[in-house]
C-alpha cells in the first residue's frame, strides 16, 4: 500500500470502530487491506468511503461496515475453516484470509472469480481455495465448515449450507427480498438456532453459474 492509501485505510478502520466494530483483529485487517485494489480505477477515489460500490456484472463490493460486522460475528467462534458464498471483488475474502487458517470461496460469475483470484495472489494470501459454481449448493467436498458467510441475500436459507455446517458452526446470511435481515444461525447437533442481527441490503443470491 502507498503511504496515502495506508492512512486512508487506517482512518476507515477508526470510523468502523466508531460505528461499533470492536474486534482489533478485524480493524487491523481493514487497515492493512488496500480496498482500491478491488475497484475499477474510476472508483478508486471512493475506496475508503464507508459505502457499497459497483464492481460490474450487477454486483457490488459491500460496505466496509457490513464486511467488518459479519467478519466480527464469524470470528466469535474462532473458526478454522470458513466458506464464503459470493467472492465478488475479493475484498471480503481478503479480510477473512488474514484472520482464519483456511478459507474456501465460491463465485458464480467467472470474470469476477478470475479477478478476485489475481487480487488475492497479489496480496500474498495463499490460504484460499477458489471455486466457480453455484453458491446455493455450497462446497460439499470441502465441508464441513466452522463458519459460512454469504455475501448476497437469499430468498430462504439454503438447505445445502445448513448441512455443510460443522457442529457448533455459524452461518451468517442475509435473507429476504425487499426487506432483508442478517441472520446468524448456529448449529448444535441436528438443531439450528437463528438470531436476527440487523436489517441489511444486499444484491440477490442467484442460482446457477454465469460464464
UniProtKB/Swiss-Prot annotation:
It is an enzyme of class 2 (transferase). It comes from Shewanella denitrificans (strain OS217 / ATCC BAA-1090 / DSM 15013). It catalyses: [protein]-L-isoaspartate + S-adenosyl-L-methionine = [protein]-L-isoaspartate alpha-methyl ester + S-adenosyl-L-homocysteine. Keywords: Cytoplasm, Methyltransferase, S-adenosyl-L-methionine, Transferase. It comes from the Bacteria. SUPFAM superfamilies: S-adenosyl-L-methionine-dependent methyltransferases (SSF53335). Signal peptide: none annotated. CDD domains: AdoMet_MTases (cd02440). The lineage of its organism: Bacteria, Pseudomonadati, Pseudomonadota, Gammaproteobacteria, Alteromonadales. GO terms for biological process: methylation; protein modification process; protein repair. Catalyzes the methyl esterification of L-isoaspartyl residues in peptides and proteins that result from spontaneous decomposition of normal L-aspartyl and L-asparaginyl residues. It plays a role in the repair and/or degradation of damaged proteins. NCBIfam families: pimt (TIGR00080), PRK00312.1 (NF001453). The keyword Lipid biosynthesis does not apply. Belongs to the methyltransferase superfamily. L-isoaspartyl/D-aspartyl protein methyltransferase family. GO terms for molecular function: protein-L-isoaspartate (D-aspartate) O-methyltransferase activity. This is Protein-L-isoaspartate O-methyltransferase.
